[in-house]
Swiss-Prot record:
PANTHER family: PROTEIN-GLUTAMATE METHYLESTERASE/PROTEIN-GLUTAMINE GLUTAMINASE, PROTEIN-GLUTAMATE METHYLESTERASE_PROTEIN-GLUTAMINE GLUTAMINASE. This is Protein-glutamate methylesterase/protein-glutamine glutaminase 2. The active site is at S176, H202, D298. It is found in: Cytoplasm. Keywords: Chemotaxis, Cytoplasm, Hydrolase, Phosphoprotein.
Amino acid sequence: MIRVVVVDDSMSMRTLLERIINGCDGMTCVGAAEDASAAREMIRALDPDVVTLDVEMPGMDGLEFLRRMMLLKPTPTIMVSGRTTSGSDAALRALELGAVDVIAKPLLTRPADLADYARDIAELIRGAAAARVKGGALAAASSAGRERACAHRPRGAKKAGIAATRLSRVIAIGASTGGTEALRTVLQDMSGTPPPILICQHMPEGFTASFAARLDAICGIRVKEAEQGEPLHYGCAYVAPGHSHLSLAATGRLYVCRLEASPPVNRHRPSVDVLFDSVARLAGKRALGAILTGMGKDGAAGLLRMRASGARTFAQDEPSCVVFGMPKEAIAMGAVDEILPLARMGARLSEALQ
């Protein structure tokens, strides 16, 4: 049984989360706190498996509480964020501090919204319960490293390289739980001016633009949220927006982004399988595919199709994953050429382009 503590200053949100958690098989809400002080005592006394934490609370906010908790008692934590720009920025900062995942507060504008939200929360809690949490000095060192990288990166707008054509190489990367930090590591470790990189990271709508901007600030290449029909360029990474599937497409000789707000695939939109399938069809042996940390199986079948089309494929190894789900499924299917620790992935992708 997964034991969960809910921390939120809104009584209605606490009640909703308690009801959802207690209605799911295999999990129970053992406590609900309205502020950081109550949460600290509750977590100390109840020792939960997972914490859901409101980003924006009066007094000590969710970020400061998370920072202290990760130093003293690292616990898998899901950030529950408002749908504002400030809320999404804070949630992404929480992922840097060691939170496992983030979910937006529900809109509940349709009767089906509650069931969808309950399903999403339950999936995140199960993933968090299986996660390896990086707390204490490790989280602090990781955060400090990002700040140093940002401080020492040359200032000024980064220019994209030449446009990519149908003869160009392409890199496709998929990730879920733990992927925000894994992607940062991979992109920072790549050398030179790589071919276009298409990224599918499972993330709610409203968060991906901020995520891309944060990566852009600390990486040597340009990173942006993908836009419909935009040509792909060398030295640029394109992040799938949270509202649409991202596919590789072509207009004439040029590679472009295709966005489609079609139904979820493997319960995800954007879906890694959708991205990988499009790259397999269009780029074939000129592509590289990598599947990183994450819960579930999204991307495994698509990576197999990439490999069958001649692409070189890679998976993150179990010890370095936050959740060894998606890579495990891909490996079991025979979709993977090389299994690598995260610390080697970026450099190996660069080597494979030679």
